[in-house]
A protein has these predicted regions:
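Trp/Phe/Arg-rich N-terminal binding region typifying the photolyase-homology
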Residues: 2-82, 86, 91-92, 96-115, ...
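Flexible, active-site-adjacent loop/turn segments at secondary-structure boundaries
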Residues: 51-52, 56, 121-124, 147, ...
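Structured ligand/cofactor/substrate-binding pocket environments in proteins
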Residues: 76-92, 136-195, 200-204
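Long, low-complexity intrinsically disordered regions
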Residues: 97-125, 195-196, 205-214
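Helix-hairpin-helix/helix-loop-helix acidic hairpins
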Residues: 120-144
């Protein structure tokens, strides 16, 4: 699942559902046969381009898979269903190993500061699309201009960045996260680690002229690419997976609902709330701000604009659905939340579960401050995540074997046995 055909898409649930309906007829064997071809920014009709909406859960993974399996069998649409579950797997993998995210986030600024003058010049050329490497420069400009790259192009770009330009993978991952409309902390960080040989230890991805020429239908034939891809060394041993998160008990009675950019389909959380006897009497949205920014550079204006519009759409829908006043808070801060809760005379706040990443980091820091003011912040863990994430203890292929059973638990599609 990748982003928009060209330009900036509408960050609304309505637009995401329209894109889903348009793609569903092509989600079967046609997708499997054509998905690896990158025809360029003017024609991405062979992929779904749904990921910006799924990243913010304007449209949920469950809805996407359910719509596809209402039209196609799992056998026919298996490759696309796997792509949806890849995103779930990456989130689960990082959820069980949050220290990997913490180390990455802390490494970006030092990696930039450690660049020599020639390396800094190479870095500046790479992000500006002026290295002289055919294809690579085009992808850099496409990313900045549209917030999109075909998944295959992302792999080639990362490989050239690491092995041909010999730049730190962390700076490449940061460049992507700041510019991709679908920039997801787990998928992005772990995909770059995979190319570098850190995710599947010792296994790297080498971009070749022949593969790029073939999969771009002759648009690009870059010269001078690295002939080898030695794995990047990591001085931190990979920790064993920790426990998966569990649904926490919710407070009964009157609550306020706080939305953030990681999950903006509050309507589908109603069954969890109803089961706990919860009444939503106020809704607010708050952004983690420059949550994807780093000391390397700020977040792309395209990304910032898409996120702002997505929050507004999610807030309006939630307010209408729960019949509650909806507000936009001035940031995901303790003071803003405290004032909002006080205005509605509530001490219990519910919020969609934020997976490991910048929003989660911000919420975790808020817990103590809010508790000291007598405010309880409870996370709503979706069944999709609760069922899937515990299986992300190893590589994707063992996880993939669980997909039929997970679909049965979700009661999606035809019997996938």
């Amino acid at each position: 699942m990748t982003a928009e055909r060209s330009g900036s898409p509408a960050a609304t649930r309505e637009a995401g559902l329209a894109r889903l309906a348009d793609f569903v007829p092509r989600a079967g064997r046609a997708y499997a046969a054509e998905r690896n071809t990158d025809r360029g920014p003017q024609d991405h009709s062979n992929v779904s381009t749904l990921s910006p909406w799924v990243r913010h859960r304007l449209v949920t993974e469950r809805e996407v898979v359910e719509a596809v399996l209402q039209r196609h069998s799992l056998d026919a649409a298996g490759k696309f269903v796997q792509e949806v579950y890849w995103r779930t797997y990456w989130k689960g993998w990082l959820e069980l190993r949050p220290s990997v995210w913490a180390r990455y986030a802390a490494s970006v600024a030092p990696a930039l500061a450690a660049l020599s003058a020639p390396e800094r010049a190479t870095y500046d050329d790479a992000i500006a699309g002026r290295t002289g490497i055919e294809g690579f420069d085009d992808w850099a400009r496409e990313l900045v201009d549209t917030g999109y790259l075909h998944n295959h192009a992302r792999m080639w770009f990362a490989s050239i960045w690491i092995f041909t330009l010999r730049l730190p993978w962390q700076l490449g991952a940061d460049f992507f996260l700041r510019h991709l409309l679908d920039g997801d902390p787990a998928s992005n960080t772990l995909s770059w680690r995979w190319v570098a040989g850190l995710q599947t230890v010792g296994k790297t991805y080498l971009a070749t002229t022949q593969n790029i020429e073939f999969a771009t239908e002759g648009r690009f034939r870059p010269r001078g690419l690295a002939a080898a891809a030695p794995a990047v060394e990591d001085d931190a041993p990979l920790a064993a997976p920790g426990p998966a998160p569990r649904a926490e008990p919710l407070p009964g009675g009157r609550v306020a609902m706080l939305l953030h950019e990681d999950d903006l389909h509050a309507e589908s959380l109603e069954p969890l709330l109803s089961a706990a006897g919860v009444e939503v009497i106020a809704v607010a949205s708050a952004s983690a701000g420059e949550s994807r920014a780093s000391q390397a550079a700020p977040t792309s204006p395209l990304v910032a604009g898409f996120t702002t519009q997505a929050l507004a759409d999610g807030r309006a829908r939630a307010g209408a659905h729960y019949g509650a006043p909806a507000s936009a808070l001035d940031g995901l801060t303790a003071s803003a939340i405290r004032d909002w809760a006080s205005a509605h005379d509530v001490t219990a706040i519910v919020t969609p579960y934020a997976p490991v990443g910048p929003v989660r980091d911000r919420l975790d820091r808020l817990d103590h401050d809010l508790a000291s003011d007598g405010l309880r912040l409870s996370r709503l863990l979706r069944p999709w995540d609760a069922r899937s994430w515990p299986h992300a203890t190893r590589g994707f292929f063992p996880f993939r074997e669980k997909i039929p059973a997970l679909l049965r638990e979700e009661q999606i599609g035809r019997d996938p046995r």
